Curated annotation (Swiss-Prot):
Residues 1-22 form the signal peptide. The keyword NAD does not apply. Belongs to the OpgD/OpgG family. GO terms for biological process: beta-glucan biosynthetic process. It comes from the Bacteria. GO terms for cellular component: outer membrane-bounded periplasmic space. InterPro entries: Gal_mutarotase_sf_dom, GH-type_carb-bd, Glucan_biosyn_MdoG/MdoD, Glucan_biosyn_MdoG_C, Ig-like_fold, Ig_E-set, MdoG_OpgG. SUPFAM superfamilies: E set domains, Galactose mutarotase-like. Involved in the biosynthesis of osmoregulated periplasmic glucans (OPGs). One of its GO terms (molecular function) is carbohydrate binding. Keywords: Periplasm, Signal. This is Glucans biosynthesis protein G.
Length: 511
Protein backbone atom coordinates (compact mmCIF):
# COMPACT_ATOMS: atom_id res chain seq x y z
CA UNK A 1 0.00 0.00 0.00
CA UNK A 2 2.86 2.34 0.91
CA UNK A 3 4.58 1.48 -2.39
CA UNK A 4 1.45 2.31 -4.40
CA UNK A 5 1.05 5.59 -2.50
CA UNK A 6 4.69 6.51 -3.24
CA UNK A 7 4.27 5.60 -6.91
CA UNK A 8 1.15 7.75 -7.17
CA UNK A 9 2.95 10.67 -5.58
CA UNK A 10 5.84 10.27 -8.01
CA UNK A 11 3.48 10.26 -10.99
CA UNK A 12 1.70 13.37 -9.70
CA UNK A 13 5.06 15.08 -9.16
CA UNK A 14 6.12 14.22 -12.71
CA UNK A 15 2.86 15.53 -14.14
CA UNK A 16 3.17 18.70 -12.09
CA UNK A 17 6.76 19.24 -13.23
CA UNK A 18 5.79 18.70 -16.86
CA UNK A 19 2.84 21.05 -16.72
CA UNK A 20 4.73 23.79 -14.88
CA UNK A 21 7.81 23.73 -17.13
CA UNK A 22 7.76 26.36 -19.84
CA UNK A 23 10.47 27.94 -21.90
CA UNK A 24 10.28 31.75 -22.00
CA UNK A 25 12.17 34.87 -23.00
CA UNK A 26 13.56 34.96 -19.46
CA UNK A 27 15.57 31.81 -20.20
CA UNK A 28 17.19 33.57 -23.16
CA UNK A 29 17.59 36.80 -21.18
CA UNK A 30 19.68 34.98 -18.56
CA UNK A 31 22.10 33.96 -21.29
CA UNK A 32 22.12 37.43 -22.81
CA UNK A 33 22.80 39.09 -19.47
CA UNK A 34 25.56 36.61 -18.71
CA UNK A 35 27.17 37.26 -22.10
CA UNK A 36 26.99 41.02 -21.56
CA UNK A 37 29.19 40.64 -18.49
CA UNK A 38 31.90 38.85 -20.45
CA UNK A 39 34.22 39.82 -23.27
CA UNK A 40 32.89 39.38 -26.80
CA UNK A 41 33.94 36.25 -28.66
CA UNK A 42 33.61 36.61 -32.42
CA UNK A 43 31.93 33.66 -34.14
CA UNK A 44 34.29 31.22 -35.80
CA UNK A 45 33.69 30.06 -39.33
CA UNK A 46 33.96 26.35 -40.07
CA UNK A 47 33.16 26.81 -43.75
CA UNK A 48 35.33 25.24 -46.48
CA UNK A 49 36.64 27.75 -49.04
CA UNK A 50 34.49 26.29 -51.82
CA UNK A 51 31.43 27.55 -49.93
CA UNK A 52 32.91 30.76 -48.53
CA UNK A 53 34.18 31.97 -51.91
CA UNK A 54 31.15 31.00 -53.98
CA UNK A 55 29.11 33.47 -56.02
CA UNK A 56 25.41 34.10 -55.49
CA UNK A 57 24.43 31.91 -58.45
CA UNK A 58 26.33 28.99 -56.91
CA UNK A 59 24.80 29.57 -53.49
CA UNK A 60 21.36 29.51 -55.11
CA UNK A 61 22.06 25.98 -56.32
CA UNK A 62 22.09 24.69 -52.75
CA UNK A 63 18.42 23.94 -52.23
CA UNK A 64 16.65 22.48 -49.23
CA UNK A 65 14.96 19.14 -49.91
CA UNK A 66 11.35 20.13 -49.27
CA UNK A 67 10.29 16.55 -48.58
CA UNK A 68 12.52 16.71 -45.48
CA UNK A 69 10.95 19.85 -44.03
CA UNK A 70 10.99 19.83 -40.24
CA UNK A 71 7.58 18.88 -38.76
CA UNK A 72 6.62 17.38 -42.12
CA UNK A 73 5.26 14.32 -40.34
CA UNK A 74 3.35 16.28 -37.71
CA UNK A 75 -0.17 17.60 -38.04
CA UNK A 76 0.86 21.22 -37.75
CA UNK A 77 0.29 23.97 -40.33
CA UNK A 78 3.85 25.28 -39.83
CA UNK A 79 6.95 23.71 -41.36
CA UNK A 80 10.63 24.62 -41.10
CA UNK A 81 13.32 24.57 -43.75
CA UNK A 82 16.95 25.53 -43.25
CA UNK A 83 19.58 27.59 -45.04
CA UNK A 84 22.99 26.15 -45.80
CA UNK A 85 26.09 28.18 -45.12
CA UNK A 86 27.74 29.88 -48.08
CA UNK A 87 29.14 33.22 -49.33
CA UNK A 88 29.03 35.73 -46.47
CA UNK A 89 26.66 33.48 -44.51
CA UNK A 90 29.78 31.77 -43.20
CA UNK A 91 29.12 31.14 -39.50
CA UNK A 92 26.70 28.56 -38.10
CA UNK A 93 23.74 29.39 -35.88
CA UNK A 94 22.26 26.99 -33.35
CA UNK A 95 18.59 26.11 -33.86
CA UNK A 96 16.57 24.36 -31.15
CA UNK A 97 13.06 22.93 -30.93
CA UNK A 98 11.04 23.67 -27.80
CA UNK A 99 8.38 21.12 -26.84
CA UNK A 100 6.05 20.90 -23.85
CA UNK A 101 8.71 19.12 -21.81
CA UNK A 102 12.15 19.82 -23.25
CA UNK A 103 14.52 21.72 -25.53
CA UNK A 104 16.18 19.73 -28.31
CA UNK A 105 18.93 20.81 -30.68
CA UNK A 106 18.01 20.47 -34.36
CA UNK A 107 21.11 18.84 -35.79
CA UNK A 108 22.57 19.77 -39.15
CA UNK A 109 22.77 17.09 -41.80
CA UNK A 110 23.90 17.48 -45.44
CA UNK A 111 21.03 15.13 -46.31
CA UNK A 112 18.68 18.08 -45.83
CA UNK A 113 20.16 19.70 -48.95
CA UNK A 114 20.55 19.24 -52.68
CA UNK A 115 23.94 20.76 -53.62
CA UNK A 116 23.30 20.96 -57.36
CA UNK A 117 26.54 21.39 -59.31
CA UNK A 118 28.53 22.60 -56.31
CA UNK A 119 31.62 20.37 -56.13
CA UNK A 120 32.55 19.60 -52.54
CA UNK A 121 34.10 17.01 -50.27
CA UNK A 122 31.23 15.29 -48.43
CA UNK A 123 33.35 14.77 -45.33
CA UNK A 124 33.90 18.52 -44.96
CA UNK A 125 30.18 19.30 -44.74
CA UNK A 126 28.97 16.60 -42.37
CA UNK A 127 29.18 18.84 -39.27
CA UNK A 128 28.81 22.34 -40.70
CA UNK A 129 25.65 23.71 -39.11
CA UNK A 130 22.87 25.89 -40.49
CA UNK A 131 23.08 29.53 -41.60
CA UNK A 132 19.43 30.24 -40.76
CA UNK A 133 15.91 29.01 -41.34
CA UNK A 134 12.62 29.75 -43.05
CA UNK A 135 9.02 29.20 -41.94
CA UNK A 136 6.38 27.74 -44.26
CA UNK A 137 2.63 28.05 -43.85
CA UNK A 138 -0.42 27.59 -46.16
CA UNK A 139 -1.07 31.32 -46.35
CA UNK A 140 -2.37 31.56 -49.94
CA UNK A 141 -3.90 28.12 -50.40
CA UNK A 142 -4.89 25.41 -47.91
CA UNK A 143 -3.07 22.70 -49.85
CA UNK A 144 0.22 24.54 -50.45
CA UNK A 145 2.89 25.62 -47.99
CA UNK A 146 4.37 29.03 -48.79
CA UNK A 147 7.44 30.62 -47.28
CA UNK A 148 6.34 33.42 -44.92
CA UNK A 149 9.45 34.13 -42.80
CA UNK A 150 13.17 34.06 -43.56
CA UNK A 151 15.78 34.49 -40.82
CA UNK A 152 19.20 34.68 -42.41
CA UNK A 153 22.26 36.85 -41.81
CA UNK A 154 23.19 39.03 -38.80
CA UNK A 155 19.86 39.91 -37.12
CA UNK A 156 17.93 40.31 -40.39
CA UNK A 157 14.56 38.73 -41.04
CA UNK A 158 11.95 39.07 -43.76
CA UNK A 159 8.21 38.44 -43.47
CA UNK A 160 5.30 38.40 -45.91
CA UNK A 161 1.54 38.04 -45.80
CA UNK A 162 -0.93 36.59 -48.28
CA UNK A 163 -0.33 37.65 -51.88
CA UNK A 164 2.98 39.34 -51.06
CA UNK A 165 6.56 38.76 -52.20
CA UNK A 166 9.70 39.47 -50.21
CA UNK A 167 10.85 43.08 -50.15
CA UNK A 168 12.15 45.07 -47.20
CA UNK A 169 13.75 43.48 -44.13
CA UNK A 170 13.51 43.97 -40.39
CA UNK A 171 16.37 43.58 -37.93
CA UNK A 172 16.76 42.82 -34.27
CA UNK A 173 19.02 45.78 -33.47
CA UNK A 174 21.19 48.40 -35.18
CA UNK A 175 24.27 49.99 -33.62
CA UNK A 176 26.01 53.21 -34.75
CA UNK A 177 24.24 53.35 -38.11
CA UNK A 178 25.65 56.16 -40.31
CA UNK A 179 28.25 57.20 -37.73
CA UNK A 180 31.84 57.87 -38.88
CA UNK A 181 33.07 55.08 -36.60
CA UNK A 182 31.23 52.54 -38.73
CA UNK A 183 28.16 50.41 -38.10
CA UNK A 184 28.16 47.34 -35.88
CA UNK A 185 25.90 44.49 -36.98
CA UNK A 186 24.64 42.30 -34.11
CA UNK A 187 23.77 38.73 -35.03
CA UNK A 188 21.32 36.14 -33.81
CA UNK A 189 23.59 33.31 -32.67
CA UNK A 190 20.94 30.89 -31.43
CA UNK A 191 17.22 30.27 -31.96
CA UNK A 192 14.56 28.35 -30.04
CA UNK A 193 11.38 27.53 -31.96
CA UNK A 194 8.27 26.26 -30.19
CA UNK A 195 6.73 23.19 -31.77
CA UNK A 196 3.20 24.29 -32.74
CA UNK A 197 0.09 22.28 -31.99
CA UNK A 198 -2.15 21.13 -34.87
CA UNK A 199 -4.63 23.94 -34.21
CA UNK A 200 -2.08 26.71 -33.63
CA UNK A 201 -2.36 29.77 -35.87
CA UNK A 202 0.83 31.37 -34.58
CA UNK A 203 4.45 30.39 -34.18
CA UNK A 204 6.79 31.53 -31.40
CA UNK A 205 10.51 31.97 -31.99
CA UNK A 206 13.12 33.04 -29.42
CA UNK A 207 16.54 34.39 -30.35
CA UNK A 208 19.80 35.22 -28.60
CA UNK A 209 21.53 38.30 -30.02
CA UNK A 210 25.23 39.02 -29.67
CA UNK A 211 27.71 41.67 -30.82
CA UNK A 212 30.87 43.38 -29.55
CA UNK A 213 28.89 45.98 -27.58
CA UNK A 214 25.43 44.49 -27.00
CA UNK A 215 23.51 41.32 -26.30
CA UNK A 216 19.79 40.67 -26.32
CA UNK A 217 16.94 38.23 -25.85
CA UNK A 218 14.06 38.28 -28.33
CA UNK A 219 10.65 36.70 -28.62
CA UNK A 220 8.85 36.76 -31.97
CA UNK A 221 5.23 35.62 -32.16
CA UNK A 222 4.43 35.22 -35.86
CA UNK A 223 0.76 35.45 -36.84
CA UNK A 224 0.32 34.78 -40.57
CA UNK A 225 -2.60 36.19 -42.53
CA UNK A 226 -3.58 38.74 -45.15
CA UNK A 227 -1.35 40.99 -43.09
CA UNK A 228 1.28 38.96 -41.28
CA UNK A 229 1.90 40.38 -37.81
CA UNK A 230 4.97 39.76 -35.67
CA UNK A 231 4.66 40.53 -31.98
CA UNK A 232 8.15 41.41 -30.74
CA UNK A 233 9.55 41.56 -27.22
CA UNK A 234 13.22 42.31 -26.61
CA UNK A 235 15.50 42.61 -23.59
CA UNK A 236 18.73 44.35 -24.57
CA UNK A 237 21.97 44.70 -22.57
CA UNK A 238 24.95 46.85 -23.48
CA UNK A 239 28.45 45.44 -23.04
CA UNK A 240 29.95 48.85 -23.65
CA UNK A 241 28.77 52.34 -24.55
CA UNK A 242 27.43 52.87 -28.07
CA UNK A 243 27.13 56.06 -30.09
CA UNK A 244 23.60 55.29 -31.22
CA UNK A 245 21.18 52.42 -30.64
CA UNK A 246 18.68 51.62 -33.39
CA UNK A 247 15.53 49.95 -32.04
CA UNK A 248 13.07 48.14 -34.35
CA UNK A 249 15.21 48.83 -37.43
CA UNK A 250 13.86 48.40 -40.95
CA UNK A 251 16.04 48.07 -44.05
CA UNK A 252 14.81 48.71 -47.58
CA UNK A 253 15.80 49.85 -51.07
CA UNK A 254 14.97 52.94 -53.11
CA UNK A 255 16.66 53.40 -56.49
CA UNK A 256 14.40 55.87 -58.28
CA UNK A 257 10.83 57.14 -58.53
CA UNK A 258 8.82 60.19 -59.66
CA UNK A 259 10.32 62.40 -56.95
CA UNK A 260 13.79 61.40 -58.18
CA UNK A 261 13.59 59.99 -61.72
CA UNK A 262 16.13 57.55 -63.12
CA UNK A 263 19.20 59.32 -64.55
CA UNK A 264 19.22 56.82 -67.42
CA UNK A 265 16.37 55.71 -69.66
CA UNK A 266 14.53 52.82 -68.01
CA UNK A 267 11.26 51.13 -68.96
CA UNK A 268 10.43 50.89 -65.27
CA UNK A 269 9.00 54.22 -64.02
CA UNK A 270 9.82 53.35 -60.40
CA UNK A 271 12.17 50.90 -58.74
CA UNK A 272 11.98 50.50 -54.98
CA UNK A 273 10.94 48.21 -52.11
CA UNK A 274 9.58 51.27 -50.27
CA UNK A 275 8.95 54.85 -51.36
CA UNK A 276 8.44 56.67 -48.08
CA UNK A 277 8.85 56.83 -44.32
CA UNK A 278 5.57 57.31 -42.46
CA UNK A 279 5.56 58.49 -38.85
CA UNK A 280 2.75 58.81 -36.32
CA UNK A 281 4.36 61.11 -33.76
CA UNK A 282 3.64 61.13 -30.05
CA UNK A 283 1.73 64.42 -30.39
CA UNK A 284 -0.62 62.90 -32.98
CA UNK A 285 0.97 64.42 -36.09
CA UNK A 286 1.28 62.20 -39.15
CA UNK A 287 4.37 62.76 -41.31
CA UNK A 288 5.22 61.44 -44.78
CA UNK A 289 8.82 61.60 -45.96
CA UNK A 290 9.40 60.45 -49.58
CA UNK A 291 12.63 58.47 -49.96
CA UNK A 292 15.70 59.46 -51.96
CA UNK A 293 18.74 57.79 -53.44
CA UNK A 294 21.21 60.60 -52.63
CA UNK A 295 24.70 61.13 -54.00
CA UNK A 296 26.00 61.42 -50.45
CA UNK A 297 25.02 59.72 -47.19
CA UNK A 298 21.99 61.54 -45.74
CA UNK A 299 20.39 61.33 -42.29
CA UNK A 300 16.99 62.80 -41.34
CA UNK A 301 15.86 62.89 -37.70
CA UNK A 302 12.38 63.42 -36.25
CA UNK A 303 12.55 64.15 -32.52
CA UNK A 304 9.53 63.20 -30.40
CA UNK A 305 8.35 61.57 -27.21
CA UNK A 306 6.56 58.22 -27.16
CA UNK A 307 6.08 57.55 -30.89
CA UNK A 308 2.78 55.96 -31.81
CA UNK A 309 4.14 54.26 -34.91
CA UNK A 310 6.45 54.43 -37.90
CA UNK A 311 7.24 52.39 -40.97
CA UNK A 312 8.65 52.15 -44.46
CA UNK A 313 5.73 51.98 -46.88
CA UNK A 314 5.13 51.11 -50.52
CA UNK A 315 2.38 53.60 -51.42
CA UNK A 316 0.78 53.21 -54.82
CA UNK A 317 0.51 49.62 -56.00
CA UNK A 318 -0.65 49.88 -59.59
CA UNK A 319 1.50 47.61 -61.76
CA UNK A 320 1.88 50.49 -64.22
CA UNK A 321 4.00 52.31 -61.64
CA UNK A 322 6.65 49.57 -61.80
CA UNK A 323 6.20 47.49 -64.99
CA UNK A 324 8.49 44.77 -63.63
CA UNK A 325 7.26 41.24 -64.31
CA UNK A 326 10.29 39.58 -62.70
CA UNK A 327 10.59 41.32 -59.35
CA UNK A 328 6.99 42.45 -58.80
CA UNK A 329 7.67 45.54 -56.72
CA UNK A 330 3.91 46.14 -56.73
CA UNK A 331 3.49 43.10 -54.45
CA UNK A 332 6.18 43.96 -51.90
CA UNK A 333 4.86 44.75 -48.44
CA UNK A 334 4.98 47.83 -46.30
CA UNK A 335 6.23 47.36 -42.73
CA UNK A 336 4.62 49.26 -39.84
CA UNK A 337 5.91 49.31 -36.26
CA UNK A 338 3.49 49.96 -33.39
CA UNK A 339 5.28 50.49 -30.07
CA UNK A 340 3.73 49.04 -26.93
CA UNK A 341 4.03 51.22 -23.86
CA UNK A 342 5.99 54.45 -23.60
CA UNK A 343 9.34 54.58 -25.38
CA UNK A 344 10.23 57.98 -23.91
CA UNK A 345 12.19 60.70 -25.69
CA UNK A 346 14.15 60.00 -28.82
CA UNK A 347 14.10 60.21 -32.59
CA UNK A 348 12.76 58.31 -35.56
CA UNK A 349 15.77 58.39 -37.85
CA UNK A 350 16.02 57.79 -41.59
CA UNK A 351 19.33 56.94 -43.25
CA UNK A 352 19.67 57.10 -47.04
CA UNK A 353 22.78 55.63 -48.68
CA UNK A 354 23.85 56.13 -52.31
CA UNK A 355 23.47 53.09 -54.57
CA UNK A 356 23.82 52.48 -58.30
CA UNK A 357 21.60 49.41 -58.51
CA UNK A 358 18.72 47.63 -56.83
CA UNK A 359 20.82 44.85 -55.29
CA UNK A 360 21.91 47.08 -52.40
CA UNK A 361 19.68 47.91 -49.46
CA UNK A 362 20.26 51.65 -49.07
CA UNK A 363 17.43 52.73 -46.73
CA UNK A 364 17.37 52.30 -42.95
CA UNK A 365 14.78 53.55 -40.44
CA UNK A 366 14.69 52.99 -36.68
CA UNK A 367 13.91 54.51 -33.29
CA UNK A 368 16.88 55.78 -31.30
CA UNK A 369 16.40 56.67 -27.60
CA UNK A 370 17.92 59.89 -26.25
CA UNK A 371 19.06 58.21 -23.05
CA UNK A 372 20.75 54.82 -22.76
CA UNK A 373 21.41 52.94 -19.53
CA UNK A 374 24.80 51.99 -18.22
CA UNK A 375 26.28 48.74 -19.59
CA UNK A 376 24.67 45.66 -18.06
CA UNK A 377 21.32 47.33 -17.33
CA UNK A 378 18.27 45.86 -19.02
CA UNK A 379 16.31 47.72 -21.70
CA UNK A 380 12.84 46.44 -22.62
CA UNK A 381 11.12 47.09 -25.92
CA UNK A 382 7.79 45.69 -27.06
CA UNK A 383 6.17 46.36 -30.43
CA UNK A 384 4.24 44.81 -33.27
CA UNK A 385 5.49 44.60 -36.82
CA UNK A 386 2.79 44.50 -39.50
CA UNK A 387 3.62 43.48 -43.07
CA UNK A 388 0.81 44.71 -45.28
CA UNK A 389 -0.26 45.79 -48.75
CA UNK A 390 -3.19 47.71 -47.29
CA UNK A 391 -1.62 51.14 -46.88
CA UNK A 392 -5.07 52.71 -46.42
CA UNK A 393 -4.95 51.39 -42.85
CA UNK A 394 -1.56 52.95 -42.21
CA UNK A 395 -2.62 56.57 -41.84
CA UNK A 396 -5.28 58.52 -39.93
CA UNK A 397 -8.74 57.80 -41.43
CA UNK A 398 -9.78 61.46 -41.19
CA UNK A 399 -6.51 62.80 -42.63
CA UNK A 400 -5.65 63.18 -46.29
CA UNK A 401 -2.39 61.48 -47.24
CA UNK A 402 0.23 61.92 -49.95
CA UNK A 403 -0.54 59.81 -53.00
CA UNK A 404 2.53 60.85 -54.95
CA UNK A 405 5.40 63.33 -55.08
CA UNK A 406 6.70 64.31 -58.51
CA UNK A 407 9.72 66.45 -59.31
CA UNK A 408 10.10 68.59 -62.42
CA UNK A 409 12.08 71.47 -63.85
CA UNK A 410 10.48 74.70 -62.66
CA UNK A 411 9.15 76.95 -65.39
CA UNK A 412 6.92 79.92 -66.13
CA UNK A 413 4.35 80.07 -68.92
CA UNK A 414 5.15 82.94 -71.30
CA UNK A 415 2.63 85.15 -73.12
CA UNK A 416 3.10 82.95 -76.19
CA UNK A 417 2.11 79.94 -74.02
CA UNK A 418 5.60 78.43 -74.19
CA UNK A 419 6.95 77.32 -70.82
CA UNK A 420 10.31 78.84 -69.99
CA UNK A 421 12.56 77.25 -67.29
CA UNK A 422 13.26 79.79 -64.55
CA UNK A 423 16.00 78.06 -62.55
CA UNK A 424 13.64 76.61 -59.95
CA UNK A 425 12.72 73.04 -59.06
CA UNK A 426 9.04 72.16 -59.15
CA UNK A 427 7.27 69.66 -56.91
CA UNK A 428 3.80 68.26 -57.55
CA UNK A 429 2.26 66.67 -54.45
CA UNK A 430 -1.13 64.96 -54.68
CA UNK A 431 -3.17 64.56 -51.48
CA UNK A 432 -6.13 62.18 -51.28
CA UNK A 433 -8.36 60.79 -48.53
CA UNK A 434 -11.83 59.51 -47.70
CA UNK A 435 -12.88 62.70 -45.90
CA UNK A 436 -11.23 64.88 -48.53
CA UNK A 437 -13.33 63.24 -51.25
CA UNK A 438 -16.45 64.54 -49.51
CA UNK A 439 -15.36 68.18 -49.79
CA UNK A 440 -16.95 70.27 -52.57
CA UNK A 441 -14.47 71.08 -55.37
CA UNK A 442 -14.73 74.80 -54.56
CA UNK A 443 -13.60 74.33 -50.93
CA UNK A 444 -10.90 76.97 -50.22
CA UNK A 445 -8.13 74.46 -49.52
CA UNK A 446 -4.78 76.14 -48.90
CA UNK A 447 -1.25 75.01 -48.06
CA UNK A 448 0.92 75.77 -45.07
CA UNK A 449 4.47 75.54 -46.37
CA UNK A 450 7.96 76.12 -45.01
CA UNK A 451 11.51 75.70 -46.25
CA UNK A 452 14.93 75.63 -44.60
CA UNK A 453 17.63 78.28 -44.84
CA UNK A 454 19.04 76.79 -48.03
CA UNK A 455 15.95 77.47 -50.13
CA UNK A 456 13.18 79.84 -51.04
CA UNK A 457 9.60 79.03 -52.05
CA UNK A 458 9.03 81.06 -55.22
CA UNK A 459 5.47 79.95 -55.80
CA UNK A 460 2.87 77.76 -54.07
CA UNK A 461 -0.65 76.96 -55.19
CA UNK A 462 -3.32 74.36 -54.49
CA UNK A 463 -5.96 73.17 -56.92
CA UNK A 464 -8.68 70.54 -56.96
CA UNK A 465 -7.75 67.30 -58.76
CA UNK A 466 -10.92 65.88 -60.37
CA UNK A 467 -9.15 62.62 -61.24
CA UNK A 468 -8.24 61.69 -57.66
CA UNK A 469 -11.03 63.71 -55.98
CA UNK A 470 -8.25 65.24 -53.92
CA UNK A 471 -6.10 68.35 -54.04
CA UNK A 472 -2.78 68.98 -55.78
CA UNK A 473 -0.08 71.17 -54.27
CA UNK A 474 2.40 72.72 -56.70
CA UNK A 475 5.62 74.23 -55.35
CA UNK A 476 8.44 76.03 -57.12
CA UNK A 477 11.60 76.16 -55.06
CA UNK A 478 14.83 78.08 -55.51
CA UNK A 479 17.91 76.39 -54.00
CA UNK A 480 20.65 78.70 -52.72
CA UNK A 481 23.55 76.23 -52.50
CA UNK A 482 23.17 73.05 -54.56
CA UNK A 483 25.96 71.40 -52.56
CA UNK A 484 23.71 71.34 -49.50
CA UNK A 485 20.44 69.56 -48.75
CA UNK A 486 17.21 71.56 -48.70
CA UNK A 487 14.43 70.77 -46.22
CA UNK A 488 10.78 71.61 -46.88
CA UNK A 489 7.40 70.85 -45.32
CA UNK A 490 3.78 71.30 -46.35
CA UNK A 491 0.27 70.43 -45.18
CA UNK A 492 -3.19 71.25 -46.52
CA UNK A 493 -5.65 73.26 -44.44
CA UNK A 494 -9.16 74.67 -44.69
CA UNK A 495 -9.19 77.82 -42.54
CA UNK A 496 -7.98 76.60 -39.12
CA UNK A 497 -8.64 72.91 -39.84
CA UNK A 498 -5.72 70.68 -40.83
CA UNK A 499 -6.80 68.40 -43.67
CA UNK A 500 -3.70 66.32 -44.34
CA UNK A 501 -0.62 64.66 -42.99
CA UNK A 502 2.61 66.66 -43.17
CA UNK A 503 4.65 66.26 -46.34
CA UNK A 504 8.30 66.45 -45.23
CA UNK A 505 10.91 66.33 -47.97
CA UNK A 506 14.66 66.64 -48.21
CA UNK A 507 16.03 67.63 -51.60
CA UNK A 508 19.41 65.89 -51.76
CA UNK A 509 22.63 67.79 -52.31
CA UNK A 510 24.09 68.11 -55.80
CA UNK A 511 20.84 67.57 -57.67
Amino acid sequence: MMKMRWLGAAIMLTLYASSSWAFSIDDVAKQAQSLAGKGYEAPKSNLPSVFRDMKYADYQQIQFNSDKAYWNNLKTPFKLEFYHQGMYFDTPVKINEVTATTVKRIKYSPDYFNFGNVQHDKDTVKDLGFAGFKVLYPINSKDKNDEIVSMLGASYFRVIGAGQVYGLSARGLAIDTALPSGEEFPRFREFWIERPKPTDKRLTVYALLDSPRATGAYRFVIIPGRDTVVDVQSKVYLRDKVGKLGVAPLTSMFLFGPNQPSPTTNYRPELHDSNGLSIHAGNGEWIWRPLNNPKHLAVSSYAMENPQGFGLLQRGREFSRFEDLDDRYDLRPSAWITPKGDWGKGKVELVEIPTNDETNDNIVAYWTPDQLPEPGKEMNFKYTLTFSRDEDKLHAPDNAWVLQTRRSTGDVKQSNLIRQPDGTIAFVVDFVGADMKKLPPDTPVAAQTSIGDNGEIVDSNVRYNPVTKGWRLMLRVKVKDAKKTTEMRAALVNADQTLSETWSYQLPANE
